[in-house]
Design a protein with these regions (language model features):
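A short, solvent-exposed, low-complexity linear motif enriched for acidic/polar residues
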Residues: 1-203
């Protein structure tokens, strides 16, 4: 399950799932970070993409906002279907799957929808300069923003004390299928679901 992050921001206290208040970019300018979030080292790799030293001393941050590509490289199963090696979907079409067998690597997309929860919204560009409404990922959006609360009451950086980012992923429901039965698995039915994620900071 490979995801490409293009921007990582800290959100100040008062932020919600729908709003990153006074966002502070802590990722490198003009660079992206690909993470295989199914690997055991995923949390460390994702965490290293952000530089906590950029945080304001004494400011409480309670959410993180991640901008990432809608395109994922995925291997897995959903319902009666499995991903098929070499298959590629698009923003407007799911990828073809297979019934049973060993899952192969497919290119899947987070689908267009106006009914996501408010912690997600689409973005035309990689830096979130032009975004859709909360809960909406539209046909012109190449990326999406994802807001997640920071566990343990948030992050407040002290002078000379920069904690380590810990990101725990759950990809058990990362692959989605839109069939309703094994007979349709070979059609265009495979898409990307959002992964489960827990974000914390440790000294």
């Amino acid at each position: 399950y490979k995801v490409t992050m293009t921007k990582l921001e800290l959100c100040e206290t008062g932020s919600t799932t729908a709003n990153c208040l006074n966002p502070l970019t802590i990722s490198p300018s003009g660079t992206s970070g690909e993470v295989d979030i199914a690997s055991v080292s995923a949390g460390a790799v994702a965490g290293s993409y952000g530089n906590i030293a950029k945080a304001k001393i004494g400011t409480l941050y309670t959410f993180i906002q991640i901008t990432m590509s809608r395109q994922f490289s995925m291997t897995g199963t959903a319902g009666s279907c499995a991903t098929k090696a070499g298959e590629t979907g698009s923003k407007t079409a799911d990828a073809k799957g297979q019934t049973g067998g060993t899952p192969g690597s497919s290119t899947l997309y987070v689908p267009d929808s106006n009914s996501y929860n408010d912690h997600m919204n689409g973005s035309v560009d990689a830096l979130g300069a032009s975004v859709s409404n909360d809960g909406v990922i539209g046909s012109s959006d190449e990326y999406f923003q994802y807001r997640k609360i920071i566990s343990g009451g948030g992050l407040k950086v002290k002078a000379g004390d920069f904690p380590t980012v810990r990101v725990a992923f759950d990809v058990s429901n990362a692959v989605g299928e839109g069939t309703g039965g094994a007979a349709a698995c070979t059609a265009n039915v495979m898409y990307a679901n959002e992964p489960g994620m827990t974000i914390s900071f440790v000294d």
